[in-house]
């Protein structure tokens, strides 16, 4: 095959120069990051994702059969809403430097979020992976919240509420605690989201439940499928290891202690539930 020498040199230069530059940039980032920690957090992120379908099944088995599909889809569809809200603005106002109350807009629409590390946020793992791990936390917080309105709220209004809640409630609280906000400056340490995830979703669920109300015609009923609830509980159990252990962001002594403590806590709870 013959090529015009001039054009061939130019095309060869253009073809080879760009990949080489890109490869060199990637290699520099690989050297800076810790590959063991990156793989570790990647696996933990996948485990935490399992918690959302797990809670969906858990709640779906506890409600009446006529409301099972709506209950399951409330948690699963929320994944889509949370993903859009988090990637567009939630991550930025949570972890970008701003003031004591809100983060800035540097990461708006995932701008400046990629394979590279961040010296202030994720010094040894890709910033994009850190963003995804935190997004899983936001997603599970919404799933926990959905349990308070099972069989009480319509599907579309709930999804609208989720989008607003992520931007107006969860993200600011995440910035207060994890993003250098006023709670962080008090010296507070929130390992694995005791405040950001559980208190925020719990209080929000309580307020939402009170506002909606149980209803006068609400009657007690037995769960329609405890097998589905059991399967969901197992998925949540499995995902909780990634949730707690991954919060160390590195495979070290803290991660192993979290792993052991989570195993013990789950076994003690299971034993207590079996006695009842």
Regions found by a protein language model. Give the residues of each.
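Short, Lys/Arg-enriched N-terminal segments with co-localized hydrophobic residues
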Residues: 7-8, 14-32
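A generic alpha-helix propensity feature with a strong bias for hydrophobic helices
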Residues: 5-10, 22, 56, 175
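Conserved small/polar residues in nucleotide/adenosyl-binding loops
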Residues: 269-276
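Acidic, glycine-enriched active-site microenvironments
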Residues: 266
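Metal/cofactor- and membrane transport-associated sequence elements
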Residues: 33-217, 223, 227-263
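Alpha-helical and His/Cys-centered functional microenvironments
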Residues: 11, 21-24, 78, 202, ...
């Amino acid at each position: 095959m013959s090529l015009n020498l001039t054009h061939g040199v130019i095309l060869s230069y253009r073809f080879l120069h760009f990949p080489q530059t890109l490869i060199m940039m990637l290699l520099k980032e690989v050297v800076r990051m810790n590959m063991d920690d990156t793989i570790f957090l990647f696996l933990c992120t996948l485990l935490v994702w399992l918690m959302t379908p797990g809670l969906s099944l858990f709640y779906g088995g506890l409600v009446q059969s006529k409301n099972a599909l709506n209950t399951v889809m409330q948690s699963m569809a929320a994944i889509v809403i949370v993903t859009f809200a988090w990637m567009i603005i939630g991550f930025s106002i949570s972890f970008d430097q701003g003031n004591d109350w809100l983060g800035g807009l540097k990461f708006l629409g995932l701008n400046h979020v990629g394979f590279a590390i961040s010296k202030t946020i994720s010094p040894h793992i890709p910033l994009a992976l850190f963003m995804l791990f935190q997004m899983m936390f936001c997603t599970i917080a919404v799933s926990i919240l959905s349990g308070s309105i099972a069989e009480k709220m319509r599907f579309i209004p709930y999804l609208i509420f989720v989008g607003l809640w992520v931007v107006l409630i969860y993200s600011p609280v995440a910035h207060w605690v994890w993003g250098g906000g006023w709670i962080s400056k008090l010296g507070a340490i929130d390992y694995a989201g005791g405040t950001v995830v559980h208190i925020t979703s719990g209080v929000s669920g309580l307020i939402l439940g009170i506002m909606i109300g149980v209803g006068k015609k609400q009657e007690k009923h037995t769960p329609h499928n405890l097998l589905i609830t059991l399967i969901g509980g197992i998925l949540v159990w499995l995902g909780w290891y990634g949730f707690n252990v991954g919060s160390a962001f590195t495979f070290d002594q803290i991660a192993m202690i979290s792993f052991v403590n989570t195993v013990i806590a789950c076994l003690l709870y299971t034993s207590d539930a079996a006695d009842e």
